[in-house]
Amino acid sequence: MTQGAPWKSILLFTVPMLIGNIAQQLYSTVDSVVVGKYIGDNALSAVGSSLPILNMLLVLFIGISTGATIMASQFFGSKSRNDLSYTIGNSITVTLIACAALIAVAAPFIRPLLTLLNTPTDPVVEGIEDYTVLDACADYLSICLFGIAGMAFYNILGGIIRGLGDSVSALLYLLVATVVNIFLDILFVASFGLGVAGVAWATIIAQFIASFLCLIKIIRMREHFDFAPKYMKPVGHYVKTIIRLGLPSGLTQAIFSSAMIIVQSLTNQFGVQFIAANIVIMRVDGFAMMPNFSFGTALTTYAGQNVGAGRYDRVIKGAKQGTLMAVGFSVVLTLAILLFGKPLMGIFTDTEELVEMSYRLMFILAFGYIAMAVTQSLSGIMRGAGDTMTPMWISIITSVIIRVPLAYIISYLTVTEDLPHGIPQCIQISLLVSWVAGALLTTVFYARGKWKTKAIKSN
């Protein structure tokens, strides 16, 4: 990505990743469709209530993946074979240790946390009172936790492959995982009647398959680095650099997930149907965000390789061109959601009232995707250059200082006799405001240019 027209390099790298992200979102969507159609809206709300906690469990590995991707791209750009070898080996070791530690620490707290968050105790299936939404959430999260290594290694190994400039292979492996996940969803839920637990098992099995394929690909890319046990022995410089670069990104996701968990407690007060509506719009929102996330990740690799090669002129050109392309995609998707929102919501449920509620909530969020295009693109540039702290602080400001308090303030100010918890739209309005604030802050800090001084030093 250090040669040729910047926009072309970015677009060619982004498109396979965008398809892969859409595929990943597709099998999350299939989870919801299968649950909503074959089990019911209460089961759909169980999956929805679980997602903020599951995202919180994954933030550690998102951080490791970010650190490994930035290091791999910069060392690949500077052709530092030894540094690249230790980066890959140490990333695998750190991931193994992190998986074991997370399972040991998190397992005892799943059910208490769900109770603390006011997770509904309505029955998942009407007439079966002894299996509630809370029980289904606990089952779903427990299975995902004990299979977390599959999700973790796909994130880390896929990130390294992209850092080396190959976004096509990661796409192919994700497509395989998507097909497997869809097949197993239908088999476990519709045929075997395993319920919400069946959805969790399908996801875990598919992720392990994708991780295994990524590992094989990395072993086959040894023309760029050496892959041997000695490189997996922890070396202080590389472990510290992975943590230094990855910790802010992991904390960013942790902060965002924590905000979602806090807001989930407010969401749960509005009842099972509102929770189900939120899971529907989260799935549609996931698709709408894909171009933004894809351009952001592509620009991280692009910036990393060009910073490694000392080409800051290309980094600046790529930032402008990549952001414009991301904004263009977001405009198209916003119009599509506004025009075709109701049919999209109808894919997930046959309940007309739920479709109407989901569309009204989605209508609010649709206007924020352009702002997120700017945030993700410029944050990607800063991360790729080695500045992972600035995006973290922006996330703290937008998620903790703006979004969470604003949601509760709007809820409090709109309380009436008919709406004892205020208007449910408080969740989406606060999120929209935080997105716009994030875009403004990211633009200001990118323009200041301190990210240009953060390149990684070789050992």
Features from the language model and the residues they span:
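Helix-terminus/linker motif at the lipid-water interface of multi-pass membrane proteins
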Residues: 26-44, 114-131, 187-194, 254-283, ...
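Short runs within selected transmembrane alpha-helices of multi-pass transporters and secretion channels
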Residues: 65, 143-162, 170-178, 199-214, ...
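Generic alpha-helical transmembrane segments of integral inner-membrane proteins
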Residues: 18, 22, 26, 30, ...
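Small-residue-rich hydrophobic transmembrane alpha-helices
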Residues: 44-104, 151-170, 277-341, 372-394
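Interfacial/gating helices of multi-pass transporter permease domains
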Residues: 35-55, 132-139, 196-197, 238-245, ...
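Transmembrane helical elements of multi-pass membrane transporters/channels
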Residues: 12-31, 143, 177, 206-210, ...
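Transmembrane alpha-helix boundary and packing residues in multipass membrane permease domains
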Residues: 17, 21, 33, 70, ...
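Short alpha-helical transmembrane segments in multi-pass integral membrane proteins
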Residues: 1-14, 72-147, 191-246, 303-368, ...
